[in-house]
Regions:
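Conserved acidic donor-binding segment of nucleotide-sugar-dependent glycosyltransferases
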Residues: 430-449, 458-463
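Aromatic "clamp/platform" in nucleotide-sugar-dependent glycosyltransferases that forms part
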Residues: 398
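Conserved donor-binding/catalytic core segment of Leloir-type glycosyltransferases
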Residues: 305-336, 347
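Short, structured helix-loop element that forms part of the nucleotide-activated donor/catalytic region
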Residues: 340, 345-372, 465
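Short hydrophobic beta-strand element within catalytic cores of glycosyltransferases
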Residues: 415-418, 422-429, 435-436
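Nucleotide-activated donor-binding/catalytic signature segment of Leloir-type glycosyltransferases, i.e.
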Residues: 237-244, 359-380
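A short, well-ordered alpha-helix in the C-terminal region of glycosyltransferases
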Residues: 440, 451, 458, 465-480, ...
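Carbohydrate-associated surface elements
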Residues: 274, 295
Length: 500
């Protein structure tokens, strides 16, 4: 354990964090840190859920604040490292109960019912790790389900997929048993964190708030559709557009986790109104929904404000080097602009540790295009220093919520060119104004390097337009996205759920 364990028996607010704070830099982690530090009168607990312990051996970027009294970490896929079970499988399992639990999950996915408060899913579909690895009843049940599958995948792939789905749930049971008592549960996502929150809400009889920074099920669907680790055979037998059974099984699993969390949540917070239809489609109830935009400490970015002529001929993409940020489109955009004879430099500012394979692919692309002299991977840097220097920031993502990097750019008076994802259109053009009336940058389609290059060039080549966007950016962030506004909204929310 890189972080010291803290073991208080109670907490005012228990944060349930999957793959974010304190190990991974990014917008959600920054939000977590600011929530903890913004409420010094509250005592916090943290349950961190990671993938495998080996993924978190590097330094910890976020030290625990003094008002964090409980900290525990669990690694969801460490159970996969061992084939030996430490306990004993039961001689007979209630196959009907297991079957009913799976039917209940399917009904939940179809929106046909709600899970019982005492759902067997809380006990991992009624199957312990020892049962899964050592029970003939579980083996026979898996065989029965397998023969019912149309266009069957290889059984070995089916078995390991099902085991991989169950393994994190066995780990979550440990977190469930060890968690401290708390007044409020707060999870910034559905997924495993939201699922654990739903179970804890029932066990501790306390309210769960899900504060979504992106639609977890949507992002996992994108990841799974792009994933190369899911083995697919007989691809030529599938209809066009048909998703392989195992890939769809994973998608359904994460959709179920999301619906389960939505059902048990007292409040479901979103960052902007445009995401509400997706939340409703995912099983949220309209009466639970609440919009609280991100906010930042605007004053801290004032020193970065300066006119275009005092800035370097550079644009920056501030974000993690991961597929969902579509760094490759940014690199291809740099290539198009370099072909025009521009001397602009393109900075990629963010951690490359989360997906080292993708980072390597991006580096190969830079070398293949001969862009080593103008595309630079800077790693983590002071955002204030970067925003003091660059002329534009760029967001090439294929999915976002309400990106903190855009708000920080605005606070520094730096216009933004962004893909049309999440709240970015609302941020750049304003929620109530007509498109182009008071722009703080330019919106472009996803995965469109020519459009991205044209937008960057349009702002770099027109100082008057750049200055107009810069002024609009500052006005918008100062009036609508102040950190103090966000804190006040959360303070009211905490008080409301505590008294209901």
């Amino acid at each position: 354990m890189l972080m010291e364990r803290r073991t208080a028996a109670t907490a005012d607010i228990l944060l349930l964090l999957e793959g974010t704070f304190p190990y991974v830099r990014g917008g959600v982690s920054s939000w977590v840190q600011r929530i903890i530090e913004g409420f010094p009168d509250r005592r916090f607990g943290i349950i961190f859920l990671g993938s495998a312990r080996s993924d978190y051996r590097r330094s910890v970027p976020y030290p625990l604040p003094a008002n964090v009294d409980y900290y525990a970490e669990y690694f969801l896929y460490d159970e996969m490292d061992s084939t030996a079970a430490t306990g004993t499988a039961r001689s007979r399992l209630d196959e009907n109960a297991i079957h009913d639990a799976h039917l209940e999950m399917k009904a939940c996915l179809k929106g046909e019912g709600f899970l019982r408060q005492d759902s067997g899913l809380a006990e991992n579909f009624g199957v312990t790790r020892e049962d899964f690895l050592g029970s003939s009843d579980v083996w026979n049940y898996l065989l029965q389900r397998y023969v019912e599958i149309p266009d069957q995948p290889a059984f070995v792939d089916y078995f390991w997929t099902v085991r991989s789905m169950h393994a994190p749930l066995w780990t979550l049971e440990k977190a469930l048993r060890a968690a401290p008592r708390t007044k409020i549960l707060l999870a910034p996502s559905t997924g495993y964190a939201g699922y654990l929150g739903a179970l804890l809400a029932a066990r501790l009889n306390c309210p769960l708030i899900i504060s979504e920074h992106g639609i977890y099920t949507k992002e996992r669907r994108i990841d799974l559709l792009l994933a190369r680790w899911i083995h697919e055979d007989e691809e030529f037998l599938r209809r066009p557009g048909q998703i392989h059974y195992l890939r769809q099984l994973w998608i359904d699993f994460f959709e179920f986790l999301g619906r389960f969390a939505y059902q048990r949540a007292r409040r479901i917070v979103n960052l902007y109104g445009g995401v509400i239809p997706l939340q409703l489609e995912g099983g949220a109830v309209e009466g639970k929904l609440l919009t609280i935009p991100n906010g930042i400490d605007v004053e801290s970015f004032v020193p970065a404000r300066r006119p275009l002529v005092q800035r370097q001929d550079a644009v920056a993409l501030i974000g993690r080097v991961v597929p969902i940020k579509d760094i490759k489109t940014f690199i291809r955009t740099a290539d198009l602009l370099r072909q025009e004879g521009r001397k602009t430099h393109f900075w990629i500012v963010g951690s490359s540790e989360e997906d080292e394979e993708y980072h390597a692919e991006c580096q190969v692309l830079v070398e293949h295009l001969g862009l080593q002299d103008c595309v630079h991977f800077l790693g983590f840097r002071s955002v204030l220093e970067i925003l003091s220097a660059v002329r534009l920031t760029v967001l090439s993502s294929i999915s976002e919520g309400l990106p903190l990097s855009v708000l920080e750019s605005f606070a520094a008076g730096v216009p933004v060119v962004s893909t049309d994802v999440g709240a970015c259109r609302e941020l750049l053009y304003g929620a109530a104004s007509a498109e182009g009336e008071a722009p703080a940058g330019i919106i472009v389609p996803i995965a469109d390097p020519p459009a991205l290059a044209a937008a960057i060039a349009a702002l770099l080549d027109d100082e008057e337009r750049w200055s107009f966007c810069s002024r609009n950016a500052v006005v918008r962030v100062e009036s609508q996205y102040q950190e103090k506004q966000m804190f006040e909204r959360y303070r009211r929310l905490f008080e409301e759920v505590s008294t209901e």
